[in-house]
Structure formats: structure tokens, C-alpha cells
């Protein structure tokens, strides 16, 4: 498939964004071959800055540069929050990571939320009488 005169090579950007960190993992279309992987904790010194939008933006731009070097020109984006018992909404770094990938020059295909949501709910930790503080 060509877009504006150039041939497209598609990849998938898996963005996992929690309240503690943001992980950007770029793979080929099958998801089997890792092209690039960066996290907020790899680009900042202080632990408290790992979930920040700034850390996500820097991690995404470094992952994008690595993927561009390997020939990826277009991306589908899959955003994931912790889900399950944890929060169902992505952390503060998700939006910044998506914007950084778009600004890096990739053609963006689909943006999809792949947060695991239980349909019947598994048992929460803490037992029958709850967590006693």
C-alpha cells in the first residue's frame, strides 16, 4: 500500500500506561517480532517521574527513532490500562505517547483500547472480611 508516493511498512505500537509507568513497545504486524521497546523509567532518573507525560513523550520519541531506522513508516496503536482489578483508564502518559508517535512522522492507522475488562469479575484480593488497616 502506498501513501503520498511512498511505500508503507506497518507496525503496531503497544502502549501500556499505568499510574506507575508507561511502556511503549513497537512490534511488527503479527506482534511476534519486537522492533523497539522503551519505558518511562528508562529515560528519567527519579522514580517519581516514571508515570509523567514528559517521560512517556521522551520514551515514545526514542522508540519511534529506533523503529524508523528499522524501516517502519506507519503504526496502528493499541493503548492498554492495567484493567482487571486495577484502573480501567490509561495513566497520564498514554496521551503524550500517542502525540509523540504522531509527531515523529509516522502515519497513524487505528487507535484501539485493549484494556482487559472482566465480564463477570474475578475475586478481588483481601478476602471475605476485606483488607484490615
UniProtKB/Swiss-Prot annotation:
<dbReference type="GO" id="GO:0005840">
    <property type="term" value="C:ribosome"/>
</dbReference>
<dbReference type="Pfam" id="PF00411">
    <property type="entry name" value="Ribosomal_S11"/>
</dbReference>
<comment type="subunit">
    <text>Part of the 30S ribosomal subunit.</text>
</comment>
<dbReference type="GO" id="GO:0019843">
    <property type="term" value="F:rRNA binding"/>
</dbReference>
<dbReference type="GO" id="GO:0006412">
    <property type="term" value="P:translation"/>
</dbReference>
<keyword id="KW-0687">Ribonucleoprotein</keyword>
<keyword id="KW-0694">RNA-binding</keyword>
<dbReference type="InterPro" id="IPR001971">
    <property type="entry name" value="Ribosomal_uS11"/>
</dbReference>
<keyword id="KW-0689">Ribosomal protein</keyword>
<dbReference type="GO" id="GO:0003735">
    <property type="term" value="F:structural constituent of ribosome"/>
</dbReference>
<keyword id="KW-0699">rRNA-binding</keyword>
<dbReference type="InterPro" id="IPR036967">
    <property type="entry name" value="Ribosomal_uS11_sf"/>
</dbReference>
<comment type="function">
    <text>Located on the platform of the 30S subunit.</text>
</comment>
<dbReference type="InterPro" id="IPR019961">
    <property type="entry name" value="Ribosomal_uS11_archaeal"/>
</dbReference>
<comment type="similarity">
    <text>Belongs to the universal ribosomal protein uS11 family.</text>
</comment>
<protein>
    <recommendedName>
        <fullName>Small ribosomal subunit protein uS11</fullName>
    </recommendedName>
</protein>
<dbReference type="InterPro" id="IPR018102">
    <property type="entry name" value="Ribosomal_uS11_CS"/>
</dbReference>
<dbReference type="GO" id="GO:1990904">
    <property type="term" value="C:ribonucleoprotein complex"/>
</dbReference>
